[in-house]
Amino acid sequence: MAKNKGLGRGLSSLLGEEVISIESEIIQIINIDKIRPNENQPRKNFEYDKIKELADSILNNGLLQPIIVDNNFQIIAGERRWRACKLAKVLEIPVIIKNLDARESMEIALIENIQRTDLTVMEEARGFKYLVENFNYTTEKLAERLGKSRSHIANLLRLNNLPQSIQDKVNENILSMGQARCLINHEHAEVMADHIISNDLNVRQTEELVRQWYKNEYTKSPNNNNKVGKRFLKDNATDNDLESLVKVLSEKFGIKVTIENYSLGGKLIFHYKNLEELDLILLKLN
């Protein structure tokens, strides 16, 4: 049988042609409750609609492709199918048991999942990081094993250096990979990210924003009206005024109020303890 090019060279080279053709493998029927997912697999989010669609297909046609597990029944390949079978309330499923130790099983499971096309950028980046840190992979070795370019792997590995809040924005498609790359190791990455999102900047504008920051053009003139040139840092000159305003607002609303001020904007935060306090705030605002 012809090899499926979508798998790349990694999984097929590790597991052999059994990944593509299972004719020579012994398929066993196992109670689904004995099977467990791999906790180290990079995919963290499974879309319910897609799992439900697969579950409906399994109910109508059965599970056409066995799940691959290790000696401890930990999934190496096929977690989506396993989840769909659970959803469809299938009691027993076909599996192929691979004679692998825990380390080999984990490595192959990671590679199999990373090679999928529907991982998010951050899921792929975290998978690369795990392989580098736990299996001594280099960028070159990963590129060869996964059939990806070294630059792609290097760029994604660097995304792991971003603050968690920005990684989450990338994962949720609020920020693109190109925008996020501009903020790696930036002192005020989170503030910059908020500005990029609120002003709907594209990648080129984001690159220019960061370039201007590092050129320190934002300090040349206190009256600089260029959006790219404005300061992001807190304006200490207004601290006294803000403290007075915080005091007035706290007394007026009877709760803790804080203000985070930046030259490009800021946040006015009301800290309420329960819904009754929230209702009072809304009543006074109206």
Curated annotation (Swiss-Prot):
Alphabetic keyword roster: Chromosome partition, DNA-binding
Function according to Swiss-Prot or TrEMBL: Involved in chromosome partition. Localize to both poles of the predivisional cell following completion of DNA replication. Binds to the DNA origin of replication.
Record's protein name: Probable chromosome-partitioning protein ParB
Any single Gene Ontology cellular-component annotation: chromosome
PANTHER family reported for this sequence: CHROMOSOME-PARTITIONING PROTEIN PARB-RELATED
Name of the coding gene: parB
Gene Ontology terms for molecular function: DNA binding
Pfam families for the chain: HTH_ParB, ParB_dimer, ParBc
Natural source organism: Rickettsia felis (strain ATCC VR-1525 / URRWXCal2) (Rickettsia azadi)
Lineage: Bacteria, Pseudomonadati, Pseudomonadota, Alphaproteobacteria, Rickettsiales
InterPro entries the UniProt entry points to: Chromosome_partition/occlusion, HTH_ParB/Spo0J, ParB/RepB/Spo0J, ParB/Sulfiredoxin_dom, ParB/Sulfiredoxin_sf, ParB_dimer_C
Gene Ontology BP term (one): positive regulation of sporulation resulting in formation of a cellular spore
Cysteines paired by S-S bonds: none
Family designation: Belongs to the ParB family.
